[in-house]
From Swiss-Prot:
One of its GO terms (biological process) is NADP biosynthetic process. It comes from Helicobacter pylori (strain Shi470). This is NAD kinase. The active site is at residue 70. Belongs to the NAD kinase family. One of its GO terms (cellular component) is cytoplasm. NAD(+) binds at residues 70-71, 139-140, 167, 169, 177, 180-185, 236. It catalyses: NAD(+) + ATP = ADP + NADP(+) + H(+). Its cofactor is a divalent metal cation. It comes from the Bacteria.
C-alpha cells in the first residue's frame, strides 16, 4: 500500500433520529471506522456537508468514503472538488447509482484499494458563475421559476450567440454523470457517464417543439431569465438569479473523481438500476 493511500476521510450526512436510517447509519459509522483501522488506514470523520471543513485534513486524505446514498456522495464531491480528491460511495439507502459498494463489500474494496486494484473514473463537472459567485455541480444545474404560477422565459446562448428561448417551468443543464438523475425524470436522454458533453432538458416547456439537446463540452453557455429565478445545484444548494442577470456555465477544469471496482460495468449498472429487460411484474 502506498503511503499516500493511508488516510481516508469519512463523510456522513446528518440524519434526524426519527429517520428510519438513523440507527443503521450510527451503527455503520462505528463499524466503518473500526474496519478502516483494522485494514491499516488512518481516518477522520466529517459529519455534515454544509461547507464546514478542516482544509488540512482534506489535503491529507487520499480519498473520501461517503456513507449513505447518492445525495451524500454528491455533497462530498462538491466539497472536495477544488482539492482534486477522489470519493467512493458505500451505499446505505435506496437507488445508489454512484455507489462503489454495499456495506458488506467494503472490506474487499479496501483490500483492493491497498493493492491498487481499484479504477479511478474521471467525469465532467460543471462550473457556474453568477456575478462574483462561482460554484461547481456534479449532476446538474437547474434554472427554476420562483413563482408557482406562470411561465419562466430563459434565453440561452452559446458563447455570445443566442440559440434558443425556453418558456416553461425551467431548464436542466446536466452532466453525463447526472443524466440518470433529475434529467432522466424530466425525459432527458441517458448519456454515457464518461462522455464530454452537456445535456439541456426543458422542464414542462410551453412549446411542443422543444426537445432535449446534447452539446459538446467545448462550448461555454450562458443563460438569462426574464424574471427572478432560482439556480439549484445538484438538488442541494440554491442561488438567486435576478431578472436578466447572466448565469455562465462551462466545463470545470477539474474532473469529478470516483473510485470504483475494476469489475464495475456501466451498462450492467443501468440494466440493474433501471430494470431493463425485466418483466412488468418484476418491475412492480
Amino acid at each position: 500500500m502506498k503511503d499516500s493511500h493511508q488516510t481516508i476521510g469519512v463523510f456522513v450526512r446528518p440524519t434526524h433520529y426519527q429517520n428510519p436510517l438513523f440507527e443503521k447509519l450510527e451503527r455503520a459509522k462505528e463499524w466503518v471506522l473500526k474496519l478502516l483501522e483494522d485494514e491499516g488506514f488512518e481516518s477522520f470523520m466529517i459529519d455534515g456537508l454544509d461547507g464546514a471543513k478542516d482544509e488540512r485534513l482534506i489535503e491529507k486524505a487520499y480519498a473520501f468514503l461517503c456513507l449513505g446514498g447518492d445525495g451524500t456522495i454528491l455533497g462530498a464531491l462538491r466539497m472536495t472538488h477544488s482539492y482534486n480528491k477522489p470519493c467512493f460511495g458505500v451505499r446505505i439507502g435506496n437507488l445508489g447509482f454512484l455507489s462503489a459498494v454495499e456495506l458488506n463489500g467494503l472490506k474487499g474494496f479496501l483490500q483492493d484499494l491497498k493493492q491498487d486494484k481499484i479504477k479511478l473514473e474521471e467525469h465532467l463537472a460543471l462550473e457556474g458563475r453568477i456575478g462574483k459567485t462561482s460554484f461547481y455541480a456534479i449532476n446538474e444545474i437547474v434554472i427554476a421559476k420562483k413563482k408557482a404560477l406562470g411561465v419562466l422565459d430563459i434565453q440561452a446562448y452559446v458563447g455570445h450567440t443566442p440559440f434558443n428561448t425556453y418558456k416553461g417551468d425551467g431548464l436542466i443543464i446536466a452532466t453525463p454523470l447526472g443524466s440518470t438523475a433529475y434529467n432522466l425524470s424530466a425525459h432527458g436522454p441517458i448519456v454515457h457517464a464518461l462522455s464530454q458533453s452537456y445535456i439541456l432538458t426543458p422542464l414542462c416547456d410551453f412549446s411542443l417543439t422543444q426537445r432535449p439537446l446534447v452539446l459538446g463540452a467545448e462550448f461555454c453557455l450562458n443563460f438569462c431569465a426574464h424574471e427572478d429565478a432560482l439556480v439549484v445545484i445538484d438538488g442541494q444548494a440554491t442561488y438567486d438569479l435576478k431578472a436578466n442577470q447572466p448565469l455562465y456555465i462551462q466545463k470545470s477544469p477539474t474532473t469529478t473523481k470516483l473510485l470504483q471496482k475494476n469489475s464495475r460495468d456501466y451498462f450492467k449498472v443501468l440494466k440493474e438500476k433501471l430494470l431493463w429487460g425485466e418483466s412488468p411484474s418484476k418491475k412492480r
